[in-house]
């Protein structure tokens, strides 16, 4: 494989996606530290706001580091040694509460919204969000290309990463050492990956800070949609 900005030639074929990965891989790999993970989290969520799958852009770079951290901690666990915190573990904060951007609080608020549009989207988003699937919310609300909702979508990432970091440093939660790759309801994968019950409840605790970030922006957006829906109903009458 040879690369010339930003196209990669792989097996004789041009591959734009591989070119983008190659361009981003070097700077992203340097950022695997605690401050660097904050930058990567914000970067990935910002890409989502512009319609680019930010998680998948950074994931190929971080995945080998995640697997290395899991393998090393599995060895520590087998030897009865203390588990080691690796900054790459903070990446899970990107999607701990309902998928990338931690949108489950937004779906829960929407279930009782005065806006018919928000309520309709929330009804089809809440259960998938519990499983970490938030495409219905991201595309249906929508969050992408929506300045009001993009702000909390990005802001909650560093906040939750900070909470995670404090949780790891205080020992309330422990690093994962068992790889769990399937989608599961909140708390299930966290328990199975650590066999630690406090990890299982941690993401539910994170609903509080993420909800505090989402709520004021939710109310602003709700007010706008309620006004539009009222105007549309008046015009139809």
Predicted regions and their residues:
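Generic multipass alpha-helical transmembrane bundles of integral membrane proteins
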Residues: 6-113
């Amino acid at each position: 494989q040879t690369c010339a900005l930003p196209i990669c030639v792989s097996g004789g074929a041009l591959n734009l996606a591989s070119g983008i990965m190659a361009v981003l891989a070097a700077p992203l790999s340097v950022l695997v530290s605690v401050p660097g993970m904050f930058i990567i989290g914000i970067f990935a969520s910002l890409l989502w706001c512009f319609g680019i799958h930010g998680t998948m852009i950074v994931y190929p770079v971080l995945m080998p580091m995640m697997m290395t951290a899991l393998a090393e901690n599995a060895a520590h666990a087998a030897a009865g040694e203390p588990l080691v915190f690796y900054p790459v573990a903070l990446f899970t904060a990107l999607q701990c509460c309902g998928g990338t951007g931690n949108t489950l609080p937004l779906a829960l608020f929407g279930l009782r919204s005065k806006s018919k549009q928000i309520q309709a989207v929330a009804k089809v988003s809440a259960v998938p969000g519990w499983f970490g699937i938030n495409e219905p919310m991201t595309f249906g609300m929508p969050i992408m290309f929506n300045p009001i909702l993009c702000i909390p979508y990005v802001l909650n990432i560093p906040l939750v990463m900070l909470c995670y970091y404090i949780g790891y440093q205080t020992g309330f939660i422990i690093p994962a050492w068992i790889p769990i790759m399937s989608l599961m309801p909140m708390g299930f994968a966290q328990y199975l990956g650590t066999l630690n019950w406090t990890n299982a409840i941690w993401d539910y605790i994170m609903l509080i800070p993420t909800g505090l970030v989402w709520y004021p922006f939710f109310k602003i957006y709700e007010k706008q949609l309620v006004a539009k829906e009222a105007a549309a109903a008046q015009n139809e009458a």
